[in-house]
Amino acid sequence: MKVHMKSLNYLLVFVFALLLSTAAFSVDKGYVGEEGTEIEVIRVSAPPPEYPRRAVRLGVEGTVRLEFDVDTDGSVLDPYVVESNPQGVFDRAAIKAVRKFLYEPPTYNGTSVKVNNVQIDLTFKLT
C-alpha cells in the first residue's frame, strides 16, 4: 500500500506540473535569399512540449535554444539544439515539440520561400 501511494504521489505531481507548466517562446525570425534578408515567420500552431517526468520529479527548470528552417508549406525542417541549460535535460522534449509547430507559409516579395536559421527559446518552468 505504501509503494502504491508513493507512485500515486509521483503521478499527481507529474500531472499537476504538466497542467501548470509553461513554455515561453521568443520572437521567430529567420533569413531568406543569398543576401540573408531577415524576415519574421508567424507561428499558427505550437503545441506545448511535454515536461520530462524526471525533471518534474526533481523540480528542474530550464531553457532550450533551437534552430530550424521553415519550409514553404509552413512546416519545421531539421530542428536541432543550439544550447540548453541544464544541458541535455529538456533537449528531446523541445525537439519533439518544435517538430509539431506550424507556421503561416512564408513569403518574401510575394513569393513562397523557405526561411533558414529560425531560432527560438523554449523555457520549461514549473509554476
What role is predicted for each listed range?
Residues 2, 6-10, 22-127:
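Charge-biased low-complexity segments
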Residues 14-20:
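Hydrophobic core
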